[in-house]
Swiss-Prot record:
Disulfide bonds join C42-C177, C63-C84. GO terms for biological process: proteolysis. Zn(2+) binds at H92, H96, H102. The lineage of its organism: Eukaryota, Metazoa, Ecdysozoa, Arthropoda, Chelicerata. Expressed by the venom gland. This is Astacin-like metalloprotease toxin 5.
Length: 186
């Protein structure tokens, strides 16, 4: 599940970044996550010199990143708030910067997942909206182990939710699970 338009991809697969001083204690972990992409894809990360367009990795109040390169250009935020500085979350947010959207937002997700909407915390429903086919590019089969797939308890109000189907420590969006099983989220 990736950005629809080529203009949202970083030129030559090179993502320019800057890490704010407030994240210095996590810099090695951030760089390790970047290396994970570089080792398994054609994506390269390069520290900002004076470029106008770059990913500004900063301390924020939540975990979020823009999906792909901004049409407008300039700095774009990648926020690592409280609880967002583990390897899997950093890998996930970098995935958004690369151009990947959530696996559970794919247009064909209902063939693979059951979303229990009644278990979604109030105000978090937008995290489970399917993307319109006109706004996304579906890549490969559904990946149950994708770093871009939320765990079964994400935004859940129910502690009895189904277990997560993968380990966020080692998975990348490029590891494809060919399973035909249907998983349940929330």
């Amino acid at each position: 599940n990736a950005v629809k338009y080529d203009q949202q991809l970083w030129p030559n697969g090179e993502i320019i970044y800057e890490i704010s001083p407030g994240l210095r204690q996590y810099e090695q972990l951030i760089l390790e996550a970047m290396r994970s992409y570089e080792d398994t894809t054609c994506i390269k990360f390069r520290r900002r010199f004076d470029e106008d367009d770059y990913v500004n990795i900063h301390v924020g109040d939540k975990c979020y990143s823009r999906v792909g390169k901004s049409f407008k250009g300039g700095p774009q935020p990648l926020s690592l708030g409280n609880g967002c500085t583990d390897f899997g979350t950093i890998l996930h947010e970098l995935g958004h910067s690369v151009g990947f959207d959530h696996e559970h937002s794919r247009t064909d997700r209902d063939e693979y997942l059951i979303i229990h909407e009644r278990n979604i915390k109030n105000g978090s429903e937008h995290n489970f909206e399917k993307l319109l086919e006109s706004k996304t590019r579906t890549i490969g089969p559904f990946d149950y182990d994708s770093i871009m797939l939320y765990g079964s308890y994400a935004f859940s109000r129910d502690t009895e939710a189904v277990e997560n189907h993968g380990t966020r420590r080692t998975r990348t969006p490029y590891e494809i699970c060919h399973s035909k099983r249907k998983a349940e989220l929330l």
